[in-house]
From Swiss-Prot:
Protein family per UniProt: Belongs to the phosphate acetyltransferase and butyryltransferase family.
EC number: 2.3.1.8
Pfam families: PTA_PTB
The protein, known as: Phosphate acetyltransferase
GO terms classed as biological process: acetyl-CoA biosynthetic process
Metabolic or biological pathway, per its Swiss-Prot or TrEMBL entry: Metabolic intermediate biosynthesis; acetyl-CoA biosynthesis; acetyl-CoA from acetate: step 2/2
GO terms assigned for molecular function: phosphate acetyltransferase activity
UniProtKB keywords: Acyltransferase, Cytoplasm, Transferase
NCBIfam families cross-referenced by the UniProt entry: PRK09653.1, pta
Reaction(s) catalysed (UniProt annotation): acetyl-CoA + phosphate = acetyl phosphate + CoA
Disulphides: none
A GO CC annotation given for this chain: cytoplasm
Length: 328
């Protein structure tokens, strides 16, 4: 993780990227906020009740005097954000409903990002994934040409660094969805200083098995390659591969001679959410890889979701990643 953070620090130096941390009443989040404030790379905006946050800071012996602290219930920004929210959700949300929703720290924080008063948001230490992602999908929405958001994990051990996706969001994917995830994952790799070599995974390697599931991945490979070419994306996307053919040169030489990737993939697109979620947890628990994420991709502005079992370090690291995404 240290190598990745060094890459991110180079990208973020002098950029003053502002990241909203809605869960300021959580001690892990507040501690991470003070650490971020001390770096000069990421500027945290902390949400919460002032009395509760200041009391927690005293208890933890934290200096939060230089951190911007906003209480959604009493903020001078609320009226402006309510009007903007009603306009964004035209015909779907009344002003009264918006007033109530923006008392919620995740909705308020997401509106800060949408209004350009912050560059990204990190939440989930005390909220479910739905609580974090729902406001983003309603307000920030996906980028043009992208029909869905997806969740990748950075899998890191020593000098090794890989991206696994989608491991968090989409339970059902067709060829178009897999192709989108492949292209967005390649873009994520580029933004984090990687040379993207994207393997689209299956239980088949280059036609070694026949089934509708294999055909789906084969079609996704063609769509992803076409989209990458149209966007002049500096990435190699190939498939379909079994995992060993994607990661072991000797296996690739036997199973996929002549393929664009020869066992040197660093971005892996799984054929289903089941496979991706199981795959990253096997690598984490049996392989000893650090799993950083899920990092959400495909949104107009970055919003990322922590695990409720997260550590201070997780909050800190994901804030750096979110800040780097904001510069894309």
């Amino acid at each position: 993780m240290a190598d990745l953070l060094n890459v991110l620090k180079d990208k973020l130096s002098g950029k003053n990227v502002k990241i909203v941390l809605p869960e300021g009443e959580d001690e892990r989040v507040l501690t991470a906020a003070t650490q971020l404030q001390a770096t000069d790379y990421v500027t945290p905006i902390v949400l919460g009740d002032e009395t509760k946050v200041q009391s927690l800071a005293q208890k933890l012996n934290l200096d939060i005097s230089n951190i911007e602290l906003i209480n959604p219930a009493t903020s001078e920004l609320k009226a402006e954000l309510v009007q903007s929210f009603v306009e964004r959700r035209k015909g779907k949300t009344t002003e009264e409903q918006a007033q109530e929703l923006l008392n919620n720290v995740n909705y308020f924080g997401t509106m800060l990002v949408y209004a350009g008063k912050a560059d990204g948001l990190v939440s989930g230490a005390a909220h479910s994934t739905g609580d974090t992602v729902r406001p983003a999908l309603q307000i920030i929405k996906t980028k043009p040409g992208v029909s869905r958001t997806s969740g990748i994990f950075f899998m890191i051990k020593g000098d090794e660094q890989y991206i696994f996706g989608d491991c968090a969001i989409n339970p059902e994917l067709d060829s178009q969805g897999l192709a989108e995830i492949a292209v967005e994952s390649a873009k994520s790799a580029l933004s984090f200083g990687m040379d993207p070599k994207v393997a689209m995974l299956s239980f088949s390697t280059k036609g070694s098995a026949k089934s509708d599931d294999v055909t789906k991945v084969q079609e996704a490979v063609k769509l992803a390659q076409q989209k990458a070419e149209e966007e002049k994306l500096e990435a190699i996307i190939d498939g379909e591969f079994q995992f060993d053919a994607a990661i072991v040169p000797g296996v690739a030489e036997k199973k996929a001679p002549g393929a664009k990737l020869q066992g040197d993939a660093n971005v892996f697109v799984f054929p289903s959410l089941e496979a991706g979620n199981i795959g990253y947890k096997i690598a984490q628990r049996l392989g000893g890889y650090d799993a950083v994420g899920p990092v959400l991709q495909g949104l107009n502005s970055p919003v990322n979701d922590l695990s409720r079992g997260c550590s201070i370090e997780d909050v800190y690291n994901l804030s750096f990643i979110t800040a780097a995404q904001a510069l894309q």
